[in-house]
């Protein structure tokens, strides 16, 4: 029996802030946004500046389906946390303005009541933004959870969650579909020589591990308390967890294409099936 299609596409791979310069064009300057297609299901991870272009594409697809008399499936939008580089695209996500679409928004990093809804309202209000989420026309369901929960956003997709080591809390995800999996582990730090057991557990034997490679090991002592990790630590974790493929993510905004190419080459010398994430990169699982 043939497997159902499962693929990952990167719409933004930069961390901290967007970077639009001639020497970052190849890997792209948009911040965190990753699309996962599990058969007909669409799961989106993080709402950085890359979300805008993805949203435009999803609305075009929905219109084509409706023209054929078909109803688009609900979209699922997962947040790791709500630092600006992971939510800057939120007000500009075109599906929110399509009354024929429904979006489920998931988060597990905040505390208190109505966590996900509160995040939307606090971000989209004056003086930071002129209008609130009440302008959205789509159906919007807010889904709160605690890290450690296993979620079922679609009938045949499960999403495992863990808490990561980052300021203001952060969530890591493992998406399981049709006997395969992808782990999205960004915005986390590490203690040198002490692999994170939670990450090793959730990434065990995964088909693809996406990991926070903001820094190099040589840079890390200067930035150890910034809440980010290194691409080399990602290699060590991928090897220890038995991951089949590895993708470096959350690149420094100042990291040039030339520097990223060098990192990618060095990474492949240690872990053959690896990439540095770039906008437009599609990985079939």
Task: List where the protein language model places each region.
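Cap/insert and terminal regions of metallo-dependent hydrolase folds
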Residues: 190-279
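Active-site flanking residues adjacent to catalytic metal/cofactor-binding acidic residues
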Residues: 45, 80, 185-186, 211-212, ...
């Amino acid at each position: 029996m043939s497997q159902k299609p499962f693929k990952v596409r990167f719409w933004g791979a930069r961390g901290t802030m967007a970077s639009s310069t001639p020497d970052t064009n190849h890997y792209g300057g948009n911040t965190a946004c990753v699309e996962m297609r599990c058969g007909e299901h669409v799961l989106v991870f993080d709402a950085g500046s890359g979300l805008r272009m993805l949203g435009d594409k999803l609305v075009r697809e929905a219109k084509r389906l409706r023209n054929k008399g078909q109803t688009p499936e609900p979209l699922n939008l997962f947040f790791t946390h709500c630092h600006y580089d992971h939510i800057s695209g939120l007000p500009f996500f075109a599906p929110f303005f399509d009354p024929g679409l429904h979006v489920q928004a998931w988060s597990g990093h905040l505390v208190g009541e109505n966590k996900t809804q509160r995040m939307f309202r606090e971000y989209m209000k004056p003086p930071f933004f002129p209008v609130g989420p009440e302008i959205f026309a789509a159906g919007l369901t807010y889904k709160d959870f605690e890290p450690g929960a296993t979620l079922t956003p679609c009938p045949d997709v499960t999403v495992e969650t863990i808490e990561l080591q980052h300021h203001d809390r952060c969530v890591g995800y493992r998406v399981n579909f049709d006997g395969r999996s992808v782990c999205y582990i960004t915005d986390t730090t590490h203690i040198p020589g002490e692999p994170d057991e939670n990450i090793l557990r959730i990434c065990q034997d995964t088909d693809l591990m996406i990991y926070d490679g903001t820094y190099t090991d040589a840079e890390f002592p200067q930035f150890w308390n910034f809440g980010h990790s290194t691409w080399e630590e990602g290699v060590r974790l991928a090897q220890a967890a038995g991951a089949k493929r590895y993708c470096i993510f959350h690149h420094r905004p100042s990291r040039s294409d030339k520097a990223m190419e060098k990192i990618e080459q060095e990474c492949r010398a240690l872990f053959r099936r690896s990439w540095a994430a770039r906008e437009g990169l599609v990985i079939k699982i």
